Amino acid sequence: MPCLSRELSARNGVMDQSLMQQTVIVVPARLASARFPSKLLAKVSGTPLILWTAMRIAREAPEFPLWFAVDSEEIGDVLEKAGFSIILTSSDLSSGTDRIAAANETIGAKRLINVQADEPLVTRSQILALTEAIEKPEADMSTLATPIVSSDDFKDSNVVKVVRDANGFAMYFSRAPIPYPRDDLEMLEKKTLPLLRHLGIYGYTAEFLRAFTILPQGDLEKVEKLEQLRALEHGYRIAVGLTDDSSIGVDTPEDLARVAPMLLAADKGVG
């Protein structure tokens, strides 16, 4: 079971050093935000959110080169003053994937890990699981999933579900409940189904990134509003790694208030 052993090695924080030398972490950082204007500059204990994310990544995965693909000098200045590397990209780019592709024209990495700028609690095991998954020979892209433990989450359209094939590759992503237990709805409560919640962090090969930026949107992406479906619709393969670590993003001021105590506790633990 080589796939399982690779997933377990990533969870345990062990990885081939040669993979690290060819892989970089790039964080797309966009100033505008519909639900929380300038959220990356919002402060927790005097420190902007983007710096909490930057410090977390640097602490959790110091082996990897770390870049920030920014669309504003304001965010760039904050990061540079703290000693982080930035690449200024166009504010007209439509997605984080496009922003990373633009940044890689300068970086020139073979594989890239996309950590969201508004997820300041990303873990080492998540980063390593993404890196292990993108190393699969058939993988064009990688992402993560974690078990769904609540029937409410399974039914929630804001919780994106993913179904994997026997080799750990994505079959489909949906906001709908999948796979749906037609004959026994109690299976939801019994937790006997392999229900997986998609976590929106990704790994890419450089070749895939170059191709993805010129692919047209497909009908599935337009209907579900899920960018990763563009890759599946055009025949690309997405390796889905497993992690026990859930993802906590900041989309609203309320999210930031909820995350703030966790950030401070984690920072105190390191100190």
How would you describe each model-predicted region?
Residues 19-70:
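N-terminal glycine-rich phosphate-binding loop and ensuing alpha1 helix
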Residues 63, 109, 138-140, 236:
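Short, high-confidence coil segments that cap the C-terminus of an alpha-helix
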Residues 189-271:
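Conserved alpha/beta core of the MobA/IspD/sugar-nucleotide pyrophosphorylase nucleotidyltransferase superfamily
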Residues 25, 66-68, 112, 142, ...:
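Hydrophobic/aromatic residues located in beta-strands of well-ordered beta-sheets
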Residues 123-215:
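Conserved core of the sugar-phosphate nucleotidyltransferase
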Residues 70-71, 122, 204, 251:
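A conserved hydrophobic position in a structured secondary element of the catalytic/binding core
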Residues 67, 73-132:
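Short phosphate-binding loop-to-helix
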